[in-house]
Amino acid sequence: MSSVNLTSLGANQLKNTTTGEMVEIGSLWREQAVVLFFLRRFGCQVCRWMAAEVSKLEKDLKAHGIALVGIGPEETGVKEFKDGGFFKGDIYIDEMKQCYKDLGFKRYNAINVVPAAMGKKVREIASKASAEGIQGNFSGDLLQSGGMLIVAKGGEKVLLHFIQKSPADNPPLEEITKALGISANVQAGEKPQCNEDVCTR
């Protein structure tokens, strides 16, 4: 059972990257179930690949009345991210990073971020992203981790609370659809074999 307090979390403010309007995160699940994808940062190559992966579900989510929303911890890189078309849902910014804190998405430090970013799984996904033409950069907050939160309509309950243990962690697409009780006709991207020459972007 998730320990997330949706009442207190729901009062946190997010900035809509299209309108600039500030909204409570709770408004995103008031009228519909929602998949909230929390990115580490918008310039992260691995995050962009993950965004493209979860976006494969957008059509099926929409057909079931479920919203797909991306949330980043800062403005840096958001225009390039949106222009790149990596993500098919609405995008918000948690400027205070309060949602990240409340959901237990950890912050790395200067010592542990390097081994985390150079891990085999990170390099494998970076290699896959490069093969698919997805590039990245090192702009912005390199220390924040992310995850995912899926909330039932009306904030009835948390359906999935996923916390990254490493920068390459992401819930499989089938885990997302299972949590929502829907089926989707999509093919998940294959995890590539590690290439020692590739490092995370």
Swiss-Prot record:
- Which reactions is this enzyme annotated as catalysing? prostaglandin H2 + [thioredoxin]-dithiol = prostaglandin F2alpha + [thioredoxin]-disulfide; prostamide F2alpha + [thioredoxin]-disulfide = prostamide H2 + [thioredoxin]-dithiol
EC number(s) from the headed UniProt entry = 1.11.1.20
Name where it mostly resides: cytoplasm
Give the UniProt subcellular location, in the record's own words: Cytoplasm, Cytosol
Q: Where are the transmembrane segments?
A: none
Keywords associated with the record:
Cytoplasm, Fatty acid biosynthesis, Fatty acid metabolism, Lipid biosynthesis, Lipid metabolism, NADP, Oxidoreductase, Prostaglandin biosynthesis, Prostaglandin metabolism
GO annotation, biological process: prostaglandin biosynthetic process
Q: What class of enzyme is it?
A: oxidoreductase
Which CDD domains has this protein been placed in? PRX_like2 (cd02970)
The Gene Ontology terms for molecular function here are: oxidoreductase activity, acting on the CH-OH group of donors, NAD or NADP as acceptor; prostaglandin F synthase activity
The task this protein performs is described as: Catalyzes the reduction of prostaglandin-ethanolamide H(2) (prostamide H(2)) to prostamide F(2alpha) with NADPH as proton donor. Also able to reduce prostaglandin H(2) to prostaglandin F(2alpha).
Protein family = Belongs to the peroxiredoxin-like PRXL2 family. Prostamide/prostaglandin F synthase subfamily.
What is the protein name given in its UniProt record?
Prostamide/prostaglandin F synthase
What is the taxonomic lineage of the source species? Eukaryota, Metazoa, Chordata, Craniata, Vertebrata
Q: Which gene name does the record give? A: prxl2b
